A protein has these predicted regions:
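Glycine-/Pro-rich loop/turn segments that contact NAD(P) or position catalytic residues
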Residues: 86-89, 93-202
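Conserved N-terminal Rossmann-fold NAD(P)-binding element of oxidoreductases
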Residues: 4-11
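Rossmann-fold cofactor-recognition segment
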Residues: 50-64
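Short beta-strand element of Class I
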Residues: 29-31
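Conserved Rossmann-fold cofactor-binding substructure of NAD(P)-dependent oxidoreductases
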Residues: 61-77, 84, 88
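Residues forming the Rossmann-fold NAD(P)(H) cofactor-binding site
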Residues: 14
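C-terminal catalytic/substrate-binding lobe primarily of soluble NAD(P)-dependent oxidoreductases
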Residues: 175-419
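Helix N-cap at the beta1-alpha1 junction of Rossmann-like dinucleotide-binding domains, i.e.
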Residues: 36-39
Length: 419
């Protein structure tokens, strides 16, 4: 029996909450909190008739530590699931520390204002020392490790699909399939079609910042950075088909490089259609992806936030998206002295997701792992004081839960490799 506070009520949060309500013997009580309480109320009203989980709602500004503390102290949850924006990771972690509550999220911290002088100085120092220049990394949250250890609390970072399940796949491969792993290629393919010329499948602001950043990968323990979208490969994905994919910087590369230091190379690829890339490049060229505030008719606006307001809400894409996603990891290495390859992945159908929880597969593949990660924490499978990423825990019960609750794994012991 557990009480959980979920902060956020967007597409991913809605899936995670819906899945929590399917496991009422563990998630006995849920409080859904967001800046817009009416969204929480609507979701609660939709779910309440079909679950034994007791659902309440609350309004909270996740940028305000005191508001968060007031809510946490009032509700007294066993766990806070942060499924809000990554800009708010640190304030929510601060509140959890102040109130003595375990924490989890689905994406690592990044700043909302990348022109803030204090943040900029730290960022530029990190770029020189680490060797990559994407705006998001784990250093801010890893800095909380001792605080959580001293408090006897667990913080689980990045428990979506990628990051999240992909790291569990890596831990599983290291535990069961290999004696030594030489290379890891993480492949994220969305073969869905929503019918729009341009739309993003999750938060547009976060998505566009991610894909317009310089790409990077880890080789022999060091970062190699490349211009954005400059390395392209083709791959034939199971149940999706041949797709173009591009090398991106992604946060799990950083944690995997730290926790699996003997791996010689770690890369991340994501598929994109030509229409998406053409639109993104045009928007970038005219300044619409900028995070720097500008003055327009006497009002300050941030271009990328204005663009977000114009684009379709990712939560609205569910009923019109058809096709499948395929996300997984390809490994090379050795087992019992012999060369070996291995591919573990999940295929998810957009329309099946919509039938079950009213969501497209992008939100589903992030929301289900969030629920399963919370399940691991609440049942005692994943608990140790400190700040951790998914690969630092036992992958077996987590992958079993994913198999059970909607994201079953597939395996290929002779996959085509990415050159």
């Amino acid at each position: 029996m557990s009480k959980v506070l979920v902060i956020g009520c967007g597409g991913v949060a809605s899936v995670a909450i819906s899945k929590c309500c399917q496991v009422s013997d563990v998630f006995t009580e849920l409080c859904i909190a967001s800046r817009t309480k009416s969204k929480c109320d609507a979701l609660a009203a939709k779910l309440a008739p079909n679950t034994k989980t007791k659902i309440t709602t609350a309004q909270v500004d996740a940028d305000d530590v005191q508001q968060l503390c007031d809510l946490i102290n009032s509700y007294k949850p066993d766990l806070v699931m942060n499924i809000a924006l990554p800009y708010q990771d640190l304030t929510i972690m601060d509140a959890c520390l102040a109130c003595g509550v375990n924490y989890m999220d689905t994406a690592n911290y990044e700043p909302e204002n990348t022109d803030d002088p204090e943040w900029r100085a730290i960022y530029e120092k990190r770029c020189k020392e680490a060797g990559f220049s994407a705006y998001f990394d784990y250093s801010w949250q890893w800095a909380y490790k001792k605080k959580f250890e001293d408090a006897g609390l667990t913080a689980l970072l990045g428990c979506g699909f990628d990051p999240g399940v992909t790291q569990a796949y890596c831990a599983y491969a290291a535990k069961h399939e290999f004696d030594t792993i030489d290379t890891i290629d993480i492949l994220d393919c969305n073969g869905g079609d929503h019918g729009y010329a341009f739309a993003t499948n999750f938060n547009p602001e976060i998505n566009l910042r991610e894909v317009s950043a310089p790409g990077s990968y880890m080789e022999n323990g060091k970062w190699v950075e490349i211009p954005a979208m400059s390395i392209k490969r083709e791959y034939n994905f199971d149940q999706v088909g041949q797709k173009d994919m591009y090398l991106l910087h992604h946060e799990e590369i950083e944690s995997l490089g730290k926790n699996l230091p003997d791996v010689k190379r770690i890369r991340f690829f994501m598929t994109f259609g030509q229409s998406y890339l053409d639109h993104m490049r045009c928007l970038e060229d005219v300044g619409m992806l900028s995070t720097t505030p500008i003055n327009f008719n006497g009002q300050e606006i941030v271009p990328i936030q204005f663009l977000k307001a114009l684009l379709p809400d990712p939560a609205s894409l569910g009923p019109r998206t058809k096709g499948k996603t395929n996300i997984g990891c390809i490994f090379t290495g050795k087992k019992d002295g012999k060369e070996k390859t291995y591919y573990i992945y999940n295929v998810c159908d957009h329309q099946e997701c919509y039938k079950e929880v009213g969501s497209q597969a992008i939100s589903y593949t992030t929301g289900v792992p969030a629920m399963c990660g919370a399940l691991m924490m609440l049942t005692g499978e994943w608990t140790k004081p400190g700040v951790y990423t998914v690969e630092e825990f036992n992958p077996d019960p987590f992958l079993d839960a994913l198999d059970k609750y909607g994201l079953p794994r597939s395996e290929n012991h002779n996959p085509v490799l990415v050159d």
